[in-house]
Curated annotation (Swiss-Prot):
The entry's keywords: Antibiotic, Antimicrobial, Disulfide bond, Immunity, Innate immunity, Secreted, Signal
Lineage: Eukaryota, Metazoa, Ecdysozoa, Arthropoda, Hexapoda
GO CC field: extracellular region; membrane
Protein known as: Putative defense protein Hdd11-like
Organism the protein comes from: Samia ricini
Free-text tissue specificity from the UniProt record: In larvae, high expression in the fat body and low expression in midgut, hemocytes and malpighian tubules. No expression in silkgland.
Pfam families tied to this protein: Reeler (PF02014)
One GO BP: innate immune response
S-S bonds: 28-105
Protein's UniProt keywords contain Disulfide bond: yes
Amino acid sequence: MMFTYVVAVASVVALTSAYPTGAPPSACFDMIPGHAADVQTVPAPYTITTAVSSVKAGHSIDVVISGKTPEDKMAGILLEARQGDKIVGTWTVSPDDTFSQPLNCGEPNNAVTHKMHAKELDRQTVSYPWTAPKDLEGDVVFKVTIVKSYAVFWVGIESAPVKVLSH
C-alpha cells in the first residue's frame, strides 16, 4: 500500500515539474522538452505555415501554427527560425497574449514559448510576426516543438523554406 502511495505522489510531482512557465533556455538548441517521455514518431497533427515564400531582410512575416482538428490543441510550444543550425531573427509577442511569451536563446526575443500552463489556455492556432535580420540573406526554416500533453509531443516540426531577400 505504501509503495502505491509513493508511486502516485512521485507521478504527480513528475507531471507538475514539466516546464509550466515555458521552455527553458537549455532547450533552445535541440528543442527537446525535459519530459520523461519519448518524442512522437507518428506524423504531427499540426502545421507551421507562412502566407509568403519570401521576405525582405529587415521586414516581417506572420508564422502560423495550427492543429489539424479542434482536438489538436497545444499545451506548450518552442518556436524558432533557423538558417542551418543558427537561430535567427526576432519574434513579436503581444503583451496581452495569455498563451505565449518571448524566449531569449542567445539573443533577445529570438524564440517563442508558452507561459504558465492551464488547460483553458491551450490553443488550436497561434500566429506570431517574425522579423528577418537586416543583414540576413538566404533560406530560413521555421521549427516548432509542440507539446499536446506531458507525454505527447513532437520536436522540430518544420515549415517550408522562406527565402530572405537582401534590400
